[in-house]
Amino acid sequence: MASAGREAGTQSEVADREIVISRVIDAPPELVFEAFTEVRHLSQWWGPNGFTTTTRSLEFRVGGEWDFVMHGPDGTDYSEWIRWTEIVPAQRIAMLHGESRDDPNAFESVLTFERDGAATRIEMRTVFPTPAMRQEAVEKYHAVEGGQQTLGNLAAYVAELAEREGEG
């Protein structure tokens, strides 16, 4: 119920808690969406440049969870957890993302996939619980740059998938 109320809020109500990142990816929404659905895909592109991802468990369904570790280029490991709150194939994915299932600082993200000719415009809209948490994510964890790099990695991976599908 709380997330529905937040989402229904006006843009100005969340502007100081929100990060929005978008990119046009040269592939159809169905293929871009597919890259989120399985470990074999996610482990190839998830995270900023220089990071790798190890999945402990993944259940891609509404209410399902993804428990994983992001390995930073400096050797630091970051435990991560996502619960999928809404999935509309090739259109929308909503999630709660934190360090663990009980993380009081978990944040909400919504990804939308919009057809743009033969390409897809993906938008990642993240809302933090407080403006201070958004600021910390931007300054300490470089959330904007990391998000842009993650979508760049997704674009490169999906281009490889599209090329392989074209050959097959």
Regions found by a protein language model. Name each.
Residues E65-G98:
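Helix-adjacent hinge/juxtasegments
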Residues V20-V24, T55-S57, S79-W81, E108-V110, ...:
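Well-ordered beta-strand positions in beta-sheet-rich domains
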